[in-house]
Amino acid sequence: MSVRYAEDRYPGGDESAGIASLHAFSFGGFYDPGNLRFGALLACNEEHLAPGAGFDEHRHSHTEIVTWVVTGELTHRDSAARTTVVRPGDLQRLRSAAGVRHSERNEGTEPLVFVQMWLAPREPGGDPAYDIVRGIADSTPYAVPEAGAMLHVRRLAPGERSAVPDGAYLYAHVVRGSVLLDGEELRPGDSARITDARGLELTGHGAHDDDRAEVLVWEMAQPG
């Protein structure tokens, strides 16, 4: 198991425009040839947008983009004339396929924090697609079959345990709270990368009963 701590992430964004970013993988102007991807996962970015800030319309292709809002509200607009407001607990997926344009902005009055994860599809091309799941439950994994991946959301009270799925590649990102994974304490922004995961368990590790942890766990097959 390889643990990457929150402070190890690459900073990015444009603070003068109200945007602060933290990148777990090489991204934009930050290039590390030893940290390009893990399994199908190409990016895990934590984005902080001040009220009124955002990413203007831009193009994506051949990428599966999954977004998880931590606090605030994210307004998504795309080239299919779709406008969606994504809130905490919602999961948004954009399949960019052969090409799609979209914008992401904080049109609310409170700061916005979201985690956005990019995955490589097994086959390029195809038609763009969009999906949103409102208030996804812990027991409902979300499949991204085009990337051979499954996302599991785990919310744990202190002392509560949950099995981690077995998989060729497993990536865990702590959104909030504290957990133990294979005896290693992980805090917000920390992540773990595990190959050939078998029989692992997450345990909530908060100091108080209301210190619930939230973890995003990607279960990924061997790249196709």
Each model region followed by its residue ranges:
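Jelly-roll (double-stranded beta-helix
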Residues: M1-G224
